[in-house]
Regions:
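N-terminal Rossmann-like FAD-binding beta1-loop-alpha1 element of flavoenzymes
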Residues: 4-29
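Glycine-rich FAD pyrophosphate-binding loop
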Residues: 22-42
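Active-site-adjacent segment of FAD-dependent monooxygenases/related oxidoreductases
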Residues: 49-112
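A conserved short coil-to-beta-strand element within the FAD-binding core of flavoproteins
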Residues: 122-135
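Core beta-strand elements of the Rossmann-like FAD/NAD(P) dinucleotide-binding domain
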Residues: 146-153
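Flavin (primarily FAD) binding-site architecture
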Residues: 157-171
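Active-site substrate-recognition segment that forms the wall
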Residues: 186, 199-227
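Conserved small/polar residues in nucleotide/adenosyl-binding loops
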Residues: 228-235
Length: 235
């Protein structure tokens, strides 16, 4: 198989890139390790910044988002027994955020690629980029016990931190920048009405909490927690 750009990873990043390149006349092949059903079952973030909503429209994928998403012009900060509202619309020259789940925008991107006959190969196992520093890179993968090869001009890694792409970057050109925090987040998805029409970011002596939402019948809550339970006190 021959294409201009081979994209490893069929999540939102890979699909969005494939869509944008297609609109510029550039051919792509997307390789995804999981099934489409699995990708669409993953629960991820649900608040889209203004720049990304504009990108969805530019990619011709924003119609359902604009119809079903919830525009939020602000958010609340809970601290010291008070609840203060920050007016995003006022302090960002009219910008806002959109509450629209990543699962839904991924579905929209899939449908856009399907309409334009984009090539997305699911259940691609043992994906491996080759000759990535050369002018003729290629990617191999296995599906149904058969090995395939995709020759291309460019290989794009959109498969996340744990994906094969990052591990395939030659050590002499790889640069990594990270900030590791000594805590984690516990997230809960609840089929209940949100406690607030807009997000609440809460500061407390025992840590941070977030009251978020996916819709008016689906809530998402996060609490700041220790990375390891062995570090927790009995109380």
């Amino acid at each position: 198989m021959k294409t201009q750009v081979c994209i490893i990873g069929g999540g939102p990043s890979g699909l969005m890139l494939s869509q944008l390149l297609h609109l510029q006349g550039i051919e792509t092949v997307v390789l995804e390790r999981q099934s489409r059903e699995y990708v669409l079952s993953r629960i991820r973030a649900g608040v889209l910044e203004n720049g990304f909503t504009e990108l969805m429209r530019q990619a011709q994928c924003g119609e359902r988002m604009d119809k079903e998403g919830e525009v939020h012009d602000g958010f609340f900060i809970a601290h010291a027994g008070k609840l203060d509202r920050v007016d995003l619309h006022k302090y960002s020259n009219g910008s806002s955020v959109m509450v629209y789940g990543q699962t839904e925008l991924t579905r929209d991107l899939y449908e856009a690629r399907d309409r334009m006959n984009g090539i997305i190969i699911h259940n691609a196992e043992d994906v491996q980029p080759h000759d990535v520093k050369s002018a003729n890179p290629y990617v191999t993968y296995r599906k149904n016990n058969t090995e395939y090869r995709v020759d291309c001009d460019y290989v794009i890694g959109a498969d996340g931190f744990h994906g094969v792409s990052r591990k395939s970057i030659p050590a002499d050109v790889l640069k990594e920048y990270e900030k590791v925090y000594p805590f984690g987040w516990l997230g809960v998805l609840s089929r209940t009405k949100p406690v607030s029409p807009e997000l609440i970011y809460a500061k407390h002596d025992r840590g941070f909490a977030l009251c978020s939402l996916r819709s008016q019948v689906l809530s998402r809550y996060y609490i700041h927690c220790l990375l390891y339970t062995s570090d927790a006190a009995d109380e």
